[in-house]
Amino acid sequence: MTLLDLSVGQVAMVKEVFAGSYGQGLVTRLEAMGIFSDKPIQVLRKAVLGGPVHVRVGSTTELAMRRSEAQLVSVHFDEPE
């Protein structure tokens, strides 16, 4: 499941960030913004007509990212123990 598959308001945990055709530079940039494994991420808004996805990383950082980048962020739901 990817970040783009989440509905608005859903919270998941980042599983992995894939480089895709962007290369390792994208992975490094997203990690610098706080998107890395086992970090909670929430979809706040999805723009219409293929626009960006607005997300919250952790409890404070908000950013907008291209849909093509959001597809490269693999997520999972935190399983209660």
Annotate the PLM regions.
Residues 23-29:
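Short alpha-helix capping/helix-loop boundary micro-motifs
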Residues 18, 45-50:
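Short, charged beta-turn/beta-strand-edge "cap" motif at the junction between a beta-strand
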Residues 2-3:
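Tandem CBS (Bateman) regulatory domains
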